[in-house]
Amino acid sequence: MVKDLVGYRFYPTGEELINHYLKNKILGKTWLVDEAISEINICSYDPIYLPSLSKIKSDDPVWYFFCPKEYTSAKKKVTKRTTSSGYWKATGVDRKIKDKRGNRGEIGIKKTLVYYEGRVPKGVWTPWVMHEYHITCLPQDQRNYVICQVMYKGEDGDVPSGGNNSSEPSQSLVSDSNTVRATSPTALEFEKPGQENFFGMSVDDLGTPKNEQEDFSLWDVLDPDMLFSDNNNPTVHPQAPHLTPNDDEFLGGLRHVNREQVEYLFANEDFISRPTLSMTENRNDHRPKKALSGIIVDYSSDSNSDAESISATSYQGTSSPGDDSVGSSNRQFLQTGGDEILSSCNDLQTYGEPSISSSTRQSQLTRSIIRPKQEVKQDTSRAVDSDTSIDKESSMVKTEKKSWFITEEAMERNRNNPRYIYLMRMIIGFILLLALISNIISVLQNLNPAMKFDRER
């Protein structure tokens, strides 16, 4: 029979529950639905007893029931949700069920409820969940039944099974989305010792240390004769990749490769296997042994000029700790490096005409040496100006810091003294002012009669 097939389950969709089962139940066509879903009053039972009341016996933690609508009172259309030991609490938003095969309109809604043990508001949550399907495509007076889909979301061993014990329990759990199923894990297959895998290697080969295995060169691996997989040929090394004899293109290309060229490319194995060194030293604190201040001699040639023009550019670098100032370092360089500059100028005779006299060269060299001295003076004047500007900026920063500290102290005082203290002080001062004014008025009134009495006399 079909019901005895492995994986066969009664799990209709929301559209099928409303369009077929609930509609036929309300319209009186019970012979079409009574075989699958039983009718009970779901609030008369605790959820733990519901699996045994299901019409279809299944090991899945999902059961279906027809339930007549029951209200708390005749006047109030409030659905009854309480049981003998707990209550069903609605949660989430109602979902619309649409007819995907017919007019694609709304045919019903689905409510989600969770069962709590105890009474409101001290109920204890349980893993029992119920989806309540209501039909909306029929008139209001005919909507007297709902379909309750009861599910258990806890552990499988905690809920009594509604199926027969002869069948082997299924490990599949059906989720709310009706799509995800978790199956019991199967045993993983591992390779046995001595059995070769897809790459021609066995577990024994993997366990052998590298230094104990035979040493093969790159050409031995790329040799076309080694690439054919022949199970009857014991000379094929298990570490070589196996190819079928039909791969003529690849093998033909390998036969045209010169072996000497391949071995030459990989001859220096130490250089290939040597790890590269990364320069991670910090060069910020590096100081040279000599001062990096001097003259770079440049030359340029022009076809219209009769003599070679030599230009020198001075540059300033990091001085050694023994140098006192920029001027001293440049002076030392000019004294000690004059001969080197002359020798370098003698060598620069490639672009100009060879008829340049020694006096012309010396005058050009003198101009190139005097120019750095003037630049050094300009640098010193700029340094003095920068020092004065730095002093001004530091004084401005100090004044700003002082003003900031004063502002912070005032803010701290305001923070320590709340606003109502200032109000109290103002009121007290105003009262004292009124008292002082009243005293002055009384004194003046006392003085007026005395003055009148003196006048009468």
Curated annotation (Swiss-Prot):
Composition bias type Low complexity, residue spans: 302-311
Span of domain NAC: 4-153
The organism's taxonomic lineage, starting at the top: Eukaryota, Viridiplantae, Streptophyta, Embryophyta, Tracheophyta
Nucleus as UniProt keyword: yes
UniProt DNA-binding residue ranges: 107-159
Keyword terms of this UniProt record: Activator, DNA-binding, Membrane, Nucleus, Stress response, Transcription, Transcription regulation, Transmembrane, Transmembrane helix
Name this protein carries in UniProt: NAC domain-containing protein 69
InterPro entries xrefs: NAC-dom, NAC_dom_sf
Places the protein is found: Membrane; Nucleus
Main location: membrane
Keyword Hydrolase among UniProt keywords: no
Disruption phenotype: No visible phenotype under normal growth conditions, but mutant plants mutant exhibit reduced sensitivity to high salinity during seed germination and seedling development.
MF GO annotations: DNA binding; DNA-binding transcription factor activity
Induction: By salt stress and abscisic acid (ABA) in roots.
Role noted for this protein: Transcription activator activated by proteolytic cleavage through regulated intramembrane proteolysis (RIP). Involved in salt stress response during seed germination and seedling growth. Binds the auxin-responsive IAA30 gene promoter and may serve as a molecular link that interconnects a developmental feedback loop of auxin signaling with a salt signal transduction pathway during seed germination.
Biological processes annotated in GO: positive regulation of DNA-templated transcription
Cellular-component GO terms for this entry: nucleus; plasma membrane
Membrane topology label: Single-pass membrane protein
Region of interest (Disordered), residue spans: 158-180, 302-332
